[in-house]
Amino acid sequence: MNEKSYQSNPDDRSDNVEKLQDMIENTLDNIDESEAAMALSTDQEKQMIKQKNENRKMSIDAMRSEIKDEEAARKNGYTE
């Protein structure tokens, strides 16, 4: 039998803050676009959009918290 040995990738956190910031910006753009789409939506679709946007806002809060954690890790030299 062939046994393959897989090596895990090293933990590269060097650009996590930037990636999270991009994700926040993209999520904010999605909120703006979905709110614009509400003008052409049915009541049911509007309700779904509102719920999605609430979920997006919660995700943004979590990402901002993660940014704080990552910035603290940078200051501490990424020690775990």
Swiss-Prot record:
It is found in: Spore core. Belongs to the Tlp family. InterPro entries: SASP_thioredoxin-like (IPR017524). Keywords: Sporulation. One of its GO terms (biological process) is asexual sporulation. NCBIfam families: SASP_tlp. This is Small, acid-soluble spore protein Tlp. Induction: Expressed only in the forespore compartment of sporulating cells.
